[in-house]
A protein has these predicted regions:
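Non-catalytic, hydrophobic alpha-helical segments
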Residues: 136, 140, 155, 166, ...
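Conserved C-terminal active-site "lid" loop/helix of NAD(P)H-dependent oxidoreductases
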Residues: 133, 152, 186-212
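Glycine/proline-rich active-site loop of Rossmann-fold NAD(P)-dependent oxidoreductases
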Residues: 34, 60, 85-102, 112-116, ...
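Active-site Tyr-X1-5-Lys
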Residues: 32, 50-83, 102-113
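Amphipathic terminal alpha-helices
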Residues: 197-199, 210-229
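Single conserved hydrophobic/aromatic residue that forms the stacking wall/gate
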Residues: 1-13
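C-terminal "lid/loop" region of Rossmann-like NAD(P)-dependent oxidoreductases
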Residues: 123, 151-153, 161-168, 175-192
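Conserved Rossmann-fold NAD(P)-dependent oxidoreductase catalytic core, especially the SDR/UDP-sugar
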Residues: 10-52, 78
Length: 229
């Protein structure tokens, strides 16, 4: 469905004479064993992660389609690859959510249930970068007005933290007082995108810190809970 939607939309925009379009990809399009931190040049250089290969191929097809339309028809379709996003209306499914909402749910449930300790996979050393969803929206508008070209742009803050630091921050914000344990025998692989320097040169205003983003998320969550009472 992702492949069909991407190609159909791009084709309609082209036929209607749309000269500017922004295609949002995903960091999962990069090879499974790409050198860290990942660069845009790593795209299509080796095997993809098998667990999300279909989705990755659909996204790759979308950004390459934009590139080919630019080349053949002179359109100005840009491709933006966001880093890990967070914020209101995220997915907190117990088995199908990303790392940040998954951690928030785990520690929230541990707090409610009075769980003495929470065990996390790995050793907590991998690095991750997060971007508040409103910052991505602002950056997308800014890129539409200030960037042209077929080269894919990685969008993010350029600031990273370890999974251990992230876990401790989540526990603090949620109010979990128990022990955090780590199981290094369990696998945990995290990828890190390299943010193009020119993004920082043209970005409009500072990005939100994780602390401030969490505060906004907590305010949204409390308002949502009140509305459901």
């Amino acid at each position: 469905s992702t492949l069909l939607a991407s190609s159909a939309a791009s084709d309609v925009y082209k036929r209607q004479g749309c000269k500017k379009l922004e295609f949002l990809g995903s960091s999962c399009i990069y090879p499974r064993m790409a050198p860290q931190p990942m660069k845009e040049s790593c795209l299509l250089t080796s095997e993809l992660e098998k667990t999300n290969e279909a989705y990755a191929l659909a996204k790759i097809s979308g950004l390459k389609y934009c590139e080919f339309l630019n080349r053949q028809y002179g359109t100005d379709y840009i491709s933006v690859m966001p880093t890990n996003l967070y914020g209101p209306n995220d997915n907190y499914h117990p088995t199908h959510s990303h790392v940040l909402p998954a951690l928030i749910r785990r520690f929230h449930e541990a707090k409610i249930n009075g769980t003495e300790s929470v065990t996390c996979w790995g050793d907590g050393s991998p690095l991750r970068e997060f971007l508040y969803v409103d910052d991505l929206a602002n950056l997308c508008v800014f890129l539409m007005n200030n960037y042209s070209g077929s080269e894919t742009v990685n969008a993010g803050t350029g600031k990273e933290l370890t999974i251990k630091e992230l876990t401790e921050l989540v526990a603090k914000v949620v109010g979990y007082k128990g022990e955090i344990k780590w199981d290094p025998t369990k696998p945990m692989q995290f990828t890190q995108e390299e943010i193009r320097e020119h993004i920082h040169e043209i970005e409009k205003g500072p990005f939100m810190t994780l602390d401030e983003g969490f505060k906004r998320f907590e305010a949204w969550k409390q308002d949502l809970l009140k509305s459901r009472l």
